[in-house]
Amino acid sequence: MKKILSALLLIFAILLSACGVVKYEYKDGVMYGDGKEATGTFEFKAGKYKVKGNFVNGVPDGLFEEYYPDGNIMIKDTFVNGENTREELYYKNGQLMGTFADDEDLKLYYNDGKLVMTYNDKTGESIIYHENGNPLMVTNDKESAIYNENKEMLFKVENAKAVDIGTTLKKLEDGSFELVKNNKVVAKIDANGELIKYLYSTGETMLKVNEATGVTEFFFKNGNTFMKEDGNKNVLNYKDGKPLYEMDGNSWKIYNEEGEKIAEDFELVTNIKKVD
C-alpha cells in the first residue's frame, strides 16, 4: 500500500512539474517569464487600470490598450520594439482626448470634441483655442498673435517687435492705461506697466500677463483659469478649473475629469496573465 501511495505521489509531482505555472514579472520595461524575456499577448494591471498588449522578446511591440474600470478604452499606445511611437487618450464617453506622436506633434481636445491645444513639431507652431473653437493664441518661431473669441486680433509681435494692429493707448486719471481698438477697450494696463489684462469682447478678463512675476494666465469666460504659464511649468485646465494637462520641464501628466492621473508609464505592474 505504501509503495502504491509513493508511486501515486511521484506521478502527481511529475504532473505538477510538467504543468507548472510560469512566473511573469515586468521589470525595467521588460516582461519576463521565469527569468527569461517573454513573448506573447498579456493582460495586467498598471496601477489601478487594466492593460492588454503584446510583447516580443520582453519588450512592448504593437498596440496596447488601457481601460477605464467600466471597460471603455482609456488609452491606446502603439509600440515599435519597445518605443512608444503614438498615444491616443479617450474620455469616458469615448471622445478623443488627445494624441501624441513620436515626432512630438500634440493635439488636445475637450470632451465635446473641440480643440484645446495643438503643437506641430515640424513648423514649431502652437495654437491655443477658445471655448468656441476659434484660435486664442498662435505662436511659432518668428511671430505670436492673440485673438479674442470673435477672431479679432488684440496683439501681435514679429521677430520680437510689436506690430501696429490699429490700437491706441489711452491714459486714465489714476495713472493706468487702456488699449483701445475700433473705439472699444481691448486691454487694461496698470500704472507701472507691469500687469496687462486682455479682455473678451464682452469685457471679461481673457488673458493676464504679469511682467513682474513672469506669470501668464488665460481665463475662461466663467472666470476659471484656462491655462497658466509660470517659468517651465504649464497647466491646462478643464472648464471647472480641474487640471487636464500639466507640464514641468520635460515631464508631463494628463488627468481625467475626476482629477485622476491617467497617462503614465507602466510604473506599477501587477496581476500579469498571458492570454495568447
Regions found by a protein language model. Name each.
Residues 17-276:
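Glycine/tyrosine- and acidic-biased, solvent-exposed loop/turn segments at the edges of beta-strands
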Residues 8-15:
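Bacterial N-terminal signal peptides
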Residues 1-4:
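Positively charged n-region of N-terminal signal peptides that target proteins for export
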